[in-house]
A protein has these predicted regions:
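Alpha-helical transmembrane spans
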Residues: 13-16
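Zymogen propeptides/activation segments of proteases
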Residues: 148, 152-182, 193-196, 202, ...
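Long, charged/polar, surface-exposed segments that mediate recognition or autoinhibition
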Residues: 287-339, 371-409
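Short linear motifs at secondary-structure transitions and domain/linker junctions
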Residues: 102-106, 146-149, 321-326, 342-345
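Preferential activation on post-signal-peptide N-terminal prodomains/segments
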Residues: 3-4, 18-310
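Exposed beta-strand-loop-beta-strand "reactive/processing" segments of non-cytosolic proteins
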Residues: 242-288, 327-375, 381-382, 412-433
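Short, Lys/Arg-rich N-terminal segment immediately upstream of the first membrane anchor
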Residues: 1-11
Length: 433
């Protein structure tokens, strides 16, 4: 009898277990109603695990991580040594970066001067720094690691010259809108002369020192007897993993609020914004007027509702780096433009590959971010991935490029950029500014 009772007990327990498992299976396959209609608990759990956008996936950024393309010329008593196809992140820039960082950190009052004074300084011992994009002086200081530089109204600095003088080195700079300026610095002239004297020439010169077709160019155009070898790029759409992109952009990757239009673009509308993902990797966003702290769309500011220019650039950089940096291949991002009016900032970034800037044929940017108050309300992206190939890029010789520029432009400043037309390969060309 005891054996029968024990057997019955085991059978009852087994039956209860089977019924429990069956109930759970039925539950997870049962669609819910209301706002969760069409989703089973199991599917919701999957969505939560794979698509939780509450986790902070944004990268931590610093302005020193922006790879600003530059051209540098060291001039001593005997020769010039030039560098091109480098950025502020490259080791080849360290010497110039150290001197200009110290100069900007110790510069006193900037006084207006003539352009001839800056040009004259280039004839003697000096370091010349040419920026690919007009850059606010305050931002340039941060890029060079100077954290305590004073605020400045110079917003479009294009070139700088540092030269020895009697009482410390003198810094000249040009602002594209406001003209030329000069300032004393705390840099030892003896230290600067010693660094310059240690360098040998490499056949670099300025157009102002040359004759013939070069004399009609901008005097600041750099002529390299042996220009750096550049290579063609393989280019592709980097928006291949939409789920990951949506999660980084704080959208639900499993949302049912999206649709595909006749052009093949995916449009996703959520409460806080709308994303448009185009087949070629272009992305457009329009969002709410206010973002929550911690969101990728929130711009931190010391003064509520009034981010400074540096804070706006930092917020835009955080978004651009989060969405683009890990998928852009060999390309790096640099700040290429910033505009402001009232409480609105528009910050743009572009790609550089191997130290050479890349330009889109339609004049657009790799990323453009609009900030109002403390919220990113719009952005546009080119999600493109670039890989340096082993094939040398074909480039017209500088003399021929100069002859063509002379016939079309007045005092053109020539430099080399990658020319992006949306194809799967990208070459280089001469651009006149």
């Amino acid at each position: 009898m005891n054996k029968n009772a024990t057997l019955m007990s085991h059978l009852q327990n087994a039956a209860i277990a089977v019924l429990t498992v069956t109930a759970v299976l039925l539950l997870i396959q049962t669609p819910l109603v209301g706002d969760l209609a069409g989703k089973t608990p199991y599917e919701l759990a999957q969505d939560w695990l794979a698509g939780d956008t509450s986790t902070d996936t944004a990268v931590t950024t610093d302005l020193t991580e922006l790879a600003l393309p530059v051209r540098v010329v060291f001039t001593n008593e005997y020769a010039r040594y030039g560098l091109s196809a480098i950025t502020t992140l490259d080791t080849d820039f360290e010497l110039a970066g150290t001197f200009f960082g110290e100069a900007l950190g110790s510069a006193t009052t900037y006084e207006a001067c003539s352009g001839e004074k800056l040009l004259t300084a280039l004839h003697a011992s000096s370091i010349y720094l040419d920026l690919e994009a007009p850059t606010p002086l305050e931002v340039l200081s941060r890029i060079l690691g100077v954290n305590d530089a004073p605020e400045s109204s110079l917003l479009r600095v294009t070139r700088l010259v540092l030269c020895p003088a009697e009482n410390g080195a003198t810094l000249y700079l040009q602002d594209a809108n406001q003209g030329f300026f000069v300032s004393r610095t705390a840099i030892s002239s003896a230290t600067l002369r010693e660094a310059l004297a240690s360098l040998d020439g490499n056949g670099t010169d300025f157009a102002f020192a040359l004759s013939g077709e070069f004399s009609q160019l901008s005097p600041y155009t750099l002529i390299f007897s042996e220009p750096p070898q550049r290579y063609t790029l393989s280019a592709s759409n980097a928006l291949t993993d939409q789920a990951t992109f949506l999660r980084l952009a704080e959208f639900n990757p499993h949302t049912e609020s999206g649709y595909t239009d006749s052009s093949g673009s995916t449009i996703i509308k959520e409460v806080y914004g709308t994303l448009r993902l185009e087949p070629d990797g272009s992305v457009f966003y329009q969002g709410a007027d206010e973002a929550e702290a911690g969101s990728i769309y929130y711009v931190s500011a010391a003064s509520i509702g009034k981010p400074t220019m540096l804070e706006a650039v930092a917020g835009a950089q955080r978004l651009a780096f989060t969405l683009l940096r890990d998928v852009s291949g060999d390309a790096e991002l640099y700040l290429s433009e910033i505009d402001s009016s009232n409480k609105r900032f528009t910050v743009s970034f572009d790609y550089a590959v191997g130290g050479t800037p890349l330009r889109f044929s339609d004049g657009s940017h790799a990323a453009t971010v609009t900030i109002e108050d403390q919220t990113i309300t719009e952005f546009s992206l080119h999600c493109r991935s670039y890989t340096l190939s082993d094939s040398p890029a074909l480039l017209l010789p500088i003399r021929q490029a100069a002859a063509i520029a002379d016939s079309k432009y007045l005092s053109a400043e020539l430099h080399v950029c990658y020319d992006e037309h949306g194809a799967d390969t990208v070459g280089v060309g001469w651009f006149a500014d």
